[in-house]
Amino acid sequence: MKRSLHLFLLLVALCSVVAACGNSSSSSATSTPSSIKLNIFAAASLTESFTQIATAYHQSHPDVTITNNFNGSQLLEQQIANGAPADVFASADMANMMKASNAGLVGDAKVFVKNRLVVIIPVGNPGQIMSLKDLARKGVKIDLEADTVPAGHYSRQALMNMSQSPDYGANFGSSVLANVVSQEENVKAVVQKVQLGEVDAGFVYRTDVTAAVASKLTILDIPDPFNVIAQYPIAVVKSSANAAAAQSFVDYVLSMAGEGILAKYHFIAVNP
C-alpha cells in the first residue's frame, strides 16, 4: 500500500513539473516580439538603390520586414490617396509629394537626393544618333515618359531649354516630340524598350543606367545649362500603422549609410 502511495505521489510530482515547463515555454513564446512590416512606396528610379537600402536596414533591424513598391511617383501618390497601405513615400519630384502633403497624406518631407537626365541609345545605334541634335531628325523613334511622370515632365523642360539655344534652334523641342512613338508610365519601361532596340533613343535618369543594362546602352549627356536636376523628397505616410519604424527607415535613408548606397547608383548628394 505504501509502495503504491509513493508511486502515485511521484507521478503527481512529475505531472506538475511537466505542466510548469509547458507554461514556461508558452509564456516565452508569447513574449517574443512580432515582426514589424513596412511598405515603402518609392519612385521606379529608386529600384536598385532602395532594394539595397532595404537589405542593409533589415540587417541592422532584423525585427523589421520591408516590402518595396516601385512605380511612377504619380501612380504611387494615387495609390496612397486611394488608401493603399503605405508607410513611407519617396517621390522623384516635389509636385507629387506636395500633392500628397496638401491632401494630408504624409508628414514633413525632406529632399534626400538629386538626379539628372540623360539620353540613352541601344548598342548598335540603329538610329545613327551621333549627338543630341540627331534626335530631331525625321524618322528617329524616341521613347519618353508621359508628361505626368516626373522624368517625362523634366525631359520636356530640358527640350524647351534646348530650344532657347541657337545651337539647337527654336523648333528643336517640337521636332523631338514629334518623333516620340511611345509614352511610358515609368522610367524602367523606357529603359526596357531602348535596350531591346524597339526604339532609337529614350530619356531617363542617369541612375537608370545600372550595371545590369550598361553593356546594352550608350549614354548621351544633356549639357548642364539645359538639364533639369530632379529633387527626391521622402516622408512618412500619416496612416502608417508603424510610424516609429517608418521614421527610423527615413532616418536611415538620410544617414551617411543611406547616402553612401545612393551614391553607388550615381545619385547626386543634396549637399555634395
Outline where the language-model segments fall.
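Periplasmic-binding protein-like
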Residues: 87-91
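Bacterial N-terminal signal peptides that target proteins for export
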Residues: 1-8
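Exported/periplasmic ABC-transporter solute-binding proteins
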Residues: 21-60, 65, 74, 78-82, ...
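Residue-level signal for mature regions of secreted extracellular proteins and peptides
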Residues: 14-15
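Central helical "cap/lid" subdomain
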Residues: 104-110
